[in-house]
Amino acid sequence: MTYLGSIEALLFVAGEDGLSLRQMAELLSLTPSALIQQLEKLAKRYEEDDDSSLLLLETAQTYKLVTKDSYMTLLRDYAKAPINQSLSRASLEVLSIIAYKQPITRIEIDDIRGVNSSGAITRLIAFGLIKEAGKKEVLGRPNLYETTNYFLDYMGINQLDDLIDASSIELVDEEVSLFSMDSINTEDKENNEN
């Protein structure tokens, strides 16, 4: 593993939230000055590589990967693709969480899902199904997300109250848990005892 590769991997996973200089320095066990040198190398590599669509963006000592302006038309065309063919299971999962828990931060979504949701959020914003809804008044002031009017149109509903009751969804989860390995193992033990 190289420092440049490690930085790139961290920034890719961090998504639109990016990472602070301090966070990366701690993760990579580098001094801030050594990390800045590596970040400058990575930024230069992206700027000079015509075959790369990426740039390294720094704002208030927070770094993230973004696409070059020359790829904007392509990305707009991609975002206009038919949604029913383009939404992944992860995107649908994130969209459901936002619909029922809005406004909600990416970190809160990640906690519910157990995995990073940056890519799905970016895609849902590009499709116009969700939007940023301000900042949460906590340390770091993370973005809040909520659904859009287009989401309501796409779902064929007039208001969020028209969504299926969330408690019925939880019931399905409870039913699914009946088939977990724990309940099967318990049944086997009971049968063996009889």
From Swiss-Prot:
Example of a GO cellular component annotation carried by this entry: cytoplasm
Assigned keywords, A-Z: Cell cycle, Cell division, Chromosome partition, Cytoplasm
Localization annotation: Cytoplasm
Protein function: Participates in chromosomal partition during cell division. May act via the formation of a condensin-like complex containing Smc and ScpA that pull DNA away from mid-cell into both cell halves.
Protein name: Segregation and condensation protein B
Quaternary structure and partners: Homodimer. Homodimerization may be required to stabilize the binding of ScpA to the Smc head domains. Component of a cohesin-like complex composed of ScpA, ScpB and the Smc homodimer, in which ScpA and ScpB bind to the head domain of Smc. The presence of the three proteins is required for the association of the complex with DNA.
InterPro entries the record matches: ScpB_csome_segregation (IPR005234), WH-like_DNA-bd_sf (IPR036388), WH_DNA-bd_sf (IPR036390)
Sections of the chain in a coiled coil: none
Record-stated family: Belongs to the ScpB family.
A Gene Ontology biological process term: chromosome separation
Species per Swiss-Prot/TrEMBL record: Streptococcus agalactiae serotype V (strain ATCC BAA-611 / 2603 V/R)
Chief place where the protein resides: cytoplasm
